[in-house]
Amino acid sequence: MNYEIPAIDIAPFLTGEPKGKAQVAAQVASAAETIGFIVLSGHGIPQSLIEKAFEQGFKFFDLPGEKKAKLHPIGPAKQRGFHGLATRGLSATIGKDAPKDLRESLFFGPIDDHAAAFAHIPDAATAYAPNILPDTPAGFDVTLVDLYRAFEKLAANLLRIFAVAARMPEDHFTPMIQKHFSIMSTHHYPALQEPPLPGQLRTGAHTDYGALTILAMTGANGGLEVQRDGGWMPVSPPKGALVVNLGDMMQRWTNSRWVSTMHRVMTPENLHDAMSRRISIGYFMHPDYDARIECLSSCKGDGAKF
């Protein structure tokens, strides 16, 4: 079967007009059942904010390695601060042995301090660990907070749309995201100065384990690819659009009616793209640490799998 990534304008849903909400929900349901990815417009996030984050992000990653290394997390808080080039590999999450990914990253977590609410759960501490913010370039820390808030609002709206698309009350997910531990990550894919190792990608093949992911991307070709029917197809959103994909949690919520799809970031094959660098910023939506991830009542059918 030949798939394409559906392009969906969610503005008609956000305006609140019943017909528009129904149309958007139907489009989202179709995309969620077939490919699990959406090219999203009408999201309301200013392009100027995204471009500012890209610009400042490039400046941050241009800093000397020893300065960036000062932001590396100490202890178990793995989703905070700076992580250097080829120090992490996402293919390991699916049990694949491959070289580490050709990217460096800056991770940023919840702004609101919810750690006390989950102090009784030993493993929750890392989910609500303090952020490690850069002080260079000037204002980058403020931009990160502003963009996190914008993604946070969009994710809440998307969950409203997803609820309607899954034939649930619009506010079904809302109580589950009041103390979320969503992660925002800025990934820098530098120009390749030498050939990659065999099997080494910019980001190895994986699925996202949260509820949903929002991605802003820019830079050279040879980027995001989505797997369907054993093949891979590129995702190249137009300027101003975002990419949204479902995570494993949403697949469980919907009893596997909706799909969390394998994806990767390829290493460019042609010299021009390989010598160009790119940056992406992803927001990985995770509900409250104690949220129950169980089959939605509308998706049980002949029985819940989860």
PLM regions with names:
Residues 1-306:
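Peripheral, non-catalytic segments flanking oxidoreductase cores
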